[in-house]
């Protein structure tokens, strides 16, 4: 089998039609899966010795949340080391990273696997993986044909990475690799709320504004602070963390501003505080709402004038620190109640960010579950940790009052329970491995009994209309691709569509 010019042109056209990088990547993967007739396809970005899924088709949704470290996935490591097409034989002893992750085939292992490393110049930027359940599924395609596919994918990915760098104004030093991927954070999610949050982080990171990060306990406020710091010009300097809720009043001032020798009993030497440690960098004050009013006043002075005084010292020290603060309280209500200074609130909330709770993030719960499953797999030395359909359904319908932190603990606990009832190094998490209270799953929809109101000819034509509409929708109204999917000649498809009233 060989690719026609039309096939390659169709792939290129789909890349151009996409609105935004994510849409283009998904169109590419979906089109490739149809053209190559594979069971699963994935586009991965390479970053810091791990592959990060950007778009998938035919794989469980939680794959998008997984981070595939090369050390734990020998096939992906082989692809990363190769400079060309990699074909894994059906009897390869190297485990496939997608075993158990093809919906409906969880108990079966992938038999055919092809990996295409993607390069920008000499730099590895990603990979394209093709998987099938039949041992010889990709034998009909030559290496040269697969190289053409890889070239198209590499071009799309390298352009996206370059645009991403330019848009973020986070250009790398001149001696760095021009297509080096941006730093990966653990802020996993594609929901509208998380997409908006990531955009806001990108905007505020380039500035030097103080940021107030609000959100319920367990939503990931510390990860937001880390993402802001790492995308900011201060990233080369330290990010210093301080949990205000864990500060006893007696040592809080010393922790923040430091002290000199002899300032109080036990002060046997000079000691720098968190502000000094964060000089030219960023200070993250977690649970800022727990600070006493006295300390709030001293913190306000630092934000206003940029100088600090160590406990027991009359001299002032200049510091250049960006402050990121986080709270799970409503600080406006705290101000009204007299428990938080209004002037400090306004100083901190120059650019407020709200981290959405997990219950408002839709399918993000499945992506995050995949991330934690992969973490458990690596930590416990397991060959695979996958979610059953029942487990995914349960996770999507639980409210998670403890948010992402509760999900993480639930996955770890479920893995331990599963291993206790099943031998071997393969773990399939079932719904019964999760102990969530008061989870009401929607009842399965009863199959409707059709009422026949048409004669055979009318019913046949209605079925044909529906089938053609679905094919066109799946192929973005590309008639040639739709004809291939329906295994008919494109001219015949046009004639049939005209007869059925689907086109003029």
From Swiss-Prot:
InterPro entries: AAA+_ATPase, GAF, GAF-like_dom_sf, Homeodomain-like_sf, NorR, P-loop_NTPase, Sigma_54_int, Sigma_54_int_dom_ATP-bd_1. Residues 479-498 bind DNA. ATP binds at residues 215-222, 278-287. One of its GO terms (biological process) is phosphorelay signal transduction system. The keyword Cytoplasm does not apply. PANTHER family: ANAEROBIC NITRIC OXIDE REDUCTASE TRANSCRIPTION REGULATOR NORR, TRANSCRIPTIONAL REGULATORY PROTEIN. This is Anaerobic nitric oxide reductase transcription regulator NorR. It comes from Escherichia fergusonii (strain ATCC 35469 / DSM 13698 / CCUG 18766 / IAM 14443 / JCM 21226 / LMG 7866 / NBRC 102419 / NCTC 12128 / CDC 0568-73).
């Amino acid at each position: 089998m060989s690719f026609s010019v039309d096939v390659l042109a169709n792939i290129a056209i789909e890349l151009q039609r996409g609105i935004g990088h994510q849409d283009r990547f998904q169109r590419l993967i979906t089109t490739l899966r149809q053209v190559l007739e594979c069971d699963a396809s994935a586009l991965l970005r390479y970053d810091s010795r791990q592959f990060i899924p950007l778009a998938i088709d035919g794989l469980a949704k939680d794959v998008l949340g997984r981070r595939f470290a090369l050390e734990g996935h020998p096939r992906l490591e082989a692809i990363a080391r190769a400079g060309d097409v990699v074909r894994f034989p059906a009897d390869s002893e190297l485990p496939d990273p997608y075993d158990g992750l093809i919906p409906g085939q969880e108990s079966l292992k992938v038999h055919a696997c092809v990996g295409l490393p993607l390069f920008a110049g000499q730099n590895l930027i990603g990979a394209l993986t093709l998987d099938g359940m039949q041992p010889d599924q990709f034998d009909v395609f030559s290496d040269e044909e697969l190289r053409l596919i890889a070239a198209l994918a590499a071009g799309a990915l390298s352009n996206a990475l370059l645009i991403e760098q330019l848009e973020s104004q986070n250009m790398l030093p001149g001696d760095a690799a021009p297509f080096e991927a941006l730093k990966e954070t653990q802020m996993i999610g594609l929901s509208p709320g998380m997409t908006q949050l990531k955009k806001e982080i990108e905007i505020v990171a380039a500035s030097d504004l103080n940021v107030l990060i609000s959100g319920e306990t367990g939503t990931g406020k510390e990860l937001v602070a880390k993402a802001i710091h790492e995308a900011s010009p201060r990233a080369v300097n330290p990010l210093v963390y301080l949990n205000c809720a864990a500060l006893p009043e007696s040592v809080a001032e010393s922790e923040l501003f430091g002290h000199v020798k002899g300032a109080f009993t036990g002060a046997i030497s000079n000691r720098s505080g968190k502000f000094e440690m964060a000089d030219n960098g960023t200070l993250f004050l977690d649970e800022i709402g727990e600070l006493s009013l006295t300390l709030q006043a001293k913190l306000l002075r630092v934000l206003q004038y940029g100088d600090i005084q160590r406990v027991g010292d009359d001299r002032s020290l200049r510091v250049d620190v960006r402050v990121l603060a986080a709270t799970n309280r409503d600080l406006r209500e705290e101000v009204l109640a007299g428990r938080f200074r209004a002037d400090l609130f306004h100083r901190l909330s120059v650019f407020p960010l709200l981290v959405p709770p997990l219950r408002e993030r839709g399918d993000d719960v499945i992506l995050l579950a995949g991330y934690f499953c992969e973490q458990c797999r690596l930590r416990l030395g397991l060959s695979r940790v996958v979610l059953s359909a029942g487990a995914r359904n349960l996770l999507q319908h639980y409210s998670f009052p403890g948010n992402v932190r509760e999900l993480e603990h639930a996955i770890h606990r479920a893995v331990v329970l599963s291993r206790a009832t099943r031998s071997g190094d393969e773990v399939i998490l079932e719904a019964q491995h999760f102990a969530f209270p008061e989870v009401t799953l929607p009842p399965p929809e009863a199959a409707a009994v059709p009422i026949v109101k048409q004669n055979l000819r009318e019913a046949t034509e209605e079925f044909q209309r529906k089938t053609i509409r679905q094919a066109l929708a799946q192929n973005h109204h590309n008639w040639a691709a739709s004809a291939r999917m329906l295994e008919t000649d494109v001219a015949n498809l046009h004639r049939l569509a005209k007869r059925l009233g689907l086109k003029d």
